Amino acid sequence: MDPKLLFLPRFQPVDLTPAWSQINLFEGIRFAFAIYSRDYSKPLLHFQKRWALAVLDLKENSPPIYILKQLAELLKNKVCYHPPMFVSQPDLARENDQHVFVYLSREKMQKVLKEQSITFGMEAVLATTIQPYRSELALQEMLRVHNLAWPHSRTEEPDLECFIAIFASSLFIHLLELKVTNVYGREVACTFFLRRGTENRPYDVVACGTTQFTKNALGISRPAASSPEPDLTLRLSGPDQEGEEGVMKPAAVNLKKEA
């Protein structure tokens, strides 16, 4: 049997463009990552193993087949975020899953979804742990940290309109840790990762949609110390809290009814 016929269709991104609130987007992203991990990655690894065994059984040892056999040895045990390719460094799953977000313009997002690739030419991919539902973060602050993290590629406001959610592969390197200040004056820690350009290469996108960063932070009054506004920051739950370790949980919010 032709080894390439043993592979599953690639994962179809969950479209979260209709998400109309912070909580809806939070839940949608969590659901999308869970679907990939629970319902897709396990059968994908099973099919990868079958493909790898078929390749390793080939009697031919020409240079292309030798490269495929090297790849097969890797794909036997690690989920790969793209189909088998003649590459020496595939995008493999990390030892511990790392959820990251790549921010981009609407036009660029449509291109990513159409071509099923996050890399174009030798352009680097900048990803961050800052989630797109963080409506307490100002667009201007997001621009500042993105340009601080990777000044080699200027980020403009349209580049933060949309997002794609992905698992960071083994080719994403830890770039730096930064802190962003939300509209209430609180600091929020974040991490940036960078993947160097490797020409156009397919990559599984988990979810996509539009961001909810605050566009007019100047119009938001900061809370008085004696009567703070509800903290809308979505925190990481610790081991002693309910829910899975490391899963983002929304803080309790008491909304006031309009008169």
Swiss-Prot record:
It catalyses: O-phospho-L-tyrosyl-[protein] + H2O = L-tyrosyl-[protein] + phosphate. InterPro entries: Glycosidase. The keyword S-adenosyl-L-methionine does not apply. GO terms for molecular function: protein tyrosine phosphatase activity. Residues 219-259 are annotated as: Disordered. Keywords: Hydrolase, Plasmid, Protein phosphatase. The keyword Hydrolase applies. It is an enzyme of class 3 (hydrolase). Its EC number is 3.1.3.48. It holds the Pfam family RolB_RolC. It comes from the Bacteria. Induces differentiation and growth of neoplastic roots (hairy roots). Seems to function as a tyrosine phosphatase. This is Protein-tyrosine phosphatase RolB. It comes from Rhizobium rhizogenes (Agrobacterium rhizogenes).
